[in-house]
Regions:
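Carboxylate-rich, polar loop motifs that coordinate divalent cations or form catalytic acidic clusters
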Residues: 1-214
Length: 214
């Protein structure tokens, strides 16, 4: 078992004035297909870290993507092109690929993400390489993960369902805290006030809904 802190790794304390306290905040980890462990060092200067299978570290500076002073990064996922998708507290979602040092941010701005909220709390990537983003004000998906760095317009889209014949956004403006994808590619959404919603792979059919009453 290994235990990494700012004393023996590039992980950073955000309260460096207190030498007796560990204040490193890691909000997400994911392995790539080469066995590298990618880490979101939430309040660090270099917020993205990589630990190789051989034990070497590398840090990445994503500050060029930041548009809001609330700098914290949240969870991290990796798509089939080895691009990393990183949710942030107030800066949308960062996308990074080490091959070519490519970076991009999806924000609330039209044509540059059109996210319903800049607080992206959860990220999930399904079997079709579709990216699901849970924000403070609703759910959106991004369908062109492999082309994210080349697209001139890269808006995410809500899932539109029919409710008694009326088009509505799946989960409306609810806060989505977590998204899980099971082996059948079905989706599980954990919300702030609406319990858990379980849908088929494309989100069009609700398979179950769980709350305090059931």
């Amino acid at each position: 078992v290994s235990f990494y802190t700012s004393e023996n790794s590039p992980l950073e304390d955000f309260f460096s004035t207190n030498p007796n306290s560990i204040t490193t905040r890691v909000n997400g980890t994911v392995f790539d297909n080469q066995g590298n462990l990618w880490i979101t060092d939430a309040l660090a200067i270099n917020k993205l870290k990589k630990l190789s299978p051989g034990g070497s570290w590398k840090s990445f500076d994503l500050r060029s993507l930041q548009t809001n002073s609330a700098q914290e990064v949240n969870m991290i996922q990796i798509d089939k092109s080895n691009s990393l998708w990183i949710g942030t507290r107030r800066n949308g979602v960062y996308v990074y690929n080490e091959n070519g040092d490519r970076k991009r941010a999806l924000t609330t701005e039209s044509t540059k993400g059109s996210l319903p909220h800049a607080n992206v709390r959860t990220v999930a990537i399904d079997n079709n390489n579709r990216v699901w983003l849970g924000t403070q004000s609703g759910l959106v998906t991004y369908n062109n993960a492999s082309g994210i760095f080349d697209a001139t317009i890269y808006d995410a889209d809500p899932i539109i369902i029919l409710d008694d014949g009326i088009p509505k956004k799946l989960l409306g403006d609810q806060t989505i805290n977590t998204i899980a994808i099971d082996g059948a590619d079905n989706k599980w959404f954990g919300t702030d006030n609406g319990g858990v919603l379980y849908t088929n792979p494309n989100g069009q059919n609700t398979l179950a809904s769980f709350n305090k009453d059931n």
